[in-house]
Amino acid sequence: MDLPGPIHDFLLVFLGSGLILGSIGVVLFPNPIYSAFSLGLVLVCISLFYILSNSYFVAAAQLLIYVGAINVLILFAVMFLNGSEYSNDFPLWTLGDGITSQVCISLFISLISTILDTSWYGIIWTTRSNQIIEQDLISNSQQIGIHLSTDFFLPFELISIILLVALIGAIVIARQ
């Protein structure tokens, strides 16, 4: 959107605060239904960020896929679970929690080391040369398709693996 500077800045601050409050709500609400609604708020704020940055296709995809499908699926799954499963009978820290936290910490450290070791200067020059090629393309949809099949192939596949693991986890939880 082409908005005047103060209005654009106000919307950025408003959406950022909504994003932060929604994220805190996802983590801190004791009721999982409220957490799922907070996740919906976070996803809507992210799609509005895309609208502010003139990425209308990505914003529409964000709303349709994440808010319209995945968040509703999460709400249904939470509502079908028995309420007694959320009691305070569980121990605070188990062996599985320790292993999971170690895996998450090691992934975080490897991500930070990869970010610090990457030569960002070379990536900027590669991006500038790709922009010349992209000017000949007809539409934004073609540009998105080319980026998904070339530059973002690995993240796209990793997201599909993460969604597959989440689906398998949901099936395991539903069988118990």
From Swiss-Prot:
Q: Catalysed reaction(s)?
A: a plastoquinone + NADH + (n+1) H(+)(in) = a plastoquinol + NAD(+) + n H(+)(out); a plastoquinone + NADPH + (n+1) H(+)(in) = a plastoquinol + NADP(+) + n H(+)(out)
Report the membrane topology from the UniProt record: Multi-pass membrane protein
UniProt feature coiled coil, ranges: none
Q: Which UniProt keywords apply?
A: Chloroplast, Membrane, NAD, NADP, Plastid, Plastoquinone, Quinone, Thylakoid, Translocase, Transmembrane, Transmembrane helix, Transport
UniProt-listed Enzyme Commission number(s):
7.1.1.-
Q: List cellular component terms (GO).
A: chloroplast thylakoid membrane
Fetch the InterPro entries from UniProt: NAD(P)H-Q_Oxidoreduct_6 (IPR050290), NADH_UbQ/plastoQ_OxRdtase_su6 (IPR001457), Nuo/plastoQ_OxRdtase_6_NuoJ (IPR042106)
Q: Where in the cell is it found?
A: Plastid, Chloroplast thylakoid membrane
- Residues that span the membrane, as ranges: 10-30, 32-52, 61-81, 105-125, 153-173
**Where the protein is mainly located, per its record?**
plastid
Q: Which GO terms describe its molecular function?
A: NADH dehydrogenase (ubiquinone) activity; quinone binding
Is the Thylakoid keyword given for this protein? yes
How this chain assembles, per its entry, is:
NDH is composed of at least 16 different subunits, 5 of which are encoded in the nucleus.
Similarity comment: Belongs to the complex I subunit 6 family.
Cited function? NDH shuttles electrons from NAD(P)H:plastoquinone, via FMN and iron-sulfur (Fe-S) centers, to quinones in the photosynthetic chain and possibly in a chloroplast respiratory chain. The immediate electron acceptor for the enzyme in this species is believed to be plastoquinone. Couples the redox reaction to proton translocation, and thus conserves the redox energy in a proton gradient.
The name this protein carries in UniProt is NAD(P)H-quinone oxidoreductase subunit 6, chloroplastic
Q: Which organism is it from?
A: Ipomoea purpurea (Common morning glory)
